[in-house]
Amino acid sequence: MATLEQRLTDLLEAPVVALGFELWGIEFIRAGKHSTLRVYIDGEHGVSVENCAEVSHQVGAIMDVEDPITEEYYLEVSSPGLDRPLFKVAQFEKYVGQEAAVTLRMATNNRRKFKGVIKAVQGDMITLTVDGKDEVLAFTNIQKANIVPNFG
């Protein structure tokens, strides 16, 4: 069965693309009474506040009609930013050579958190070089991943 995020991606990807943006990813964060649906968009030339407002208006209208989330929530539309989250295998491929912070669902080698350089992507296996050692992680076991910005 598809997760809520997967169902929302299926619902919203085509309308976001039709507006000229890439649907980078979706997070649904439950926090008591104040859940948040966060929609990340990216564009060839970046994303402006006006772009986010335009996509927010369209996404809000679709969500009102389709009503896939029955509880109350806040809708946020934003750029993924410099520390962009990675939601898809293709995004890991795009950032080979960049540093990433990864949290796993289940521990590998007695660890759940890794920070290292994305070395390679083969199928759904991500190789991360951590402290000079290669760690091969299954994409399906990744709970959360973000690019670590390099300001040097």
From Swiss-Prot:
At the top level, the lineage of the source is: Bacteria
**According to its UniProt record, where is this protein located?**
Cytoplasm
One biological-process term from Gene Ontology? translation
Query: Cellular component GO terms, alphabetically?
Result: cytosol
Q: Which UniProt keywords apply?
A: Cytoplasm, Ribosome biogenesis
Q: List, alphabetically, the Pfam families matched.
A: DUF150_C, RimP_N
Q: What is this protein called?
A: Ribosome maturation factor RimP
Identify the taxonomic lineage of the organism of origin: Bacteria, Pseudomonadati, Pseudomonadota, Gammaproteobacteria, Aeromonadales
